[in-house]
Curated annotation (Swiss-Prot):
PANTHER family: FAMILY WITH SEQUENCE SIMILARITY 216 MEMBER A, PROTEIN FAM216B. This is Protein FAM216B. It comes from the Eukaryota. Belongs to the FAM216 family. InterPro entries: FAM216. Disulfide bonds: none annotated. It comes from Homo sapiens. Transmembrane segments: none annotated.
Amino acid sequence: MGQNWKRQQKLWNVPQLPFIRVPPSIYDTSLLKALNQGQQRYFYSIMRIYNSRPQWEALQTRYIHSLQHQQLLGYITQREALSYALVLRDSTKRASAKVAPQRTIPRKTSAMTRRCPSVLPVSVVLPRAQSKRRQVLRN
């Protein structure tokens, strides 16, 4: 009986790998369709490692907790805390919905672009141009 108990204890100490469950929504992706179940689990585990969404969510909650703490200490008002939280929520919505736009306008060659901006503002008219106009008007 004692030997059997020792064997069971040895089996308990063996580290077990966590079971990776691939969600059904991921099964239909083109990357995982041709793979068998073990390959799908392995690939999904890699996808989870490189997913930045949990880090973003943790950063957002940390920022919200920081806002609440500053409000409790009296550094900011409740209205300010709510406005900051709304800005955070709206910016994350825009960032998640943003798709890289396609560039349709061809870039100019380096010879066509200005290397240094003009020193004069746009509204300044050169005196020589004004004097030429006056000469044309006088004739």
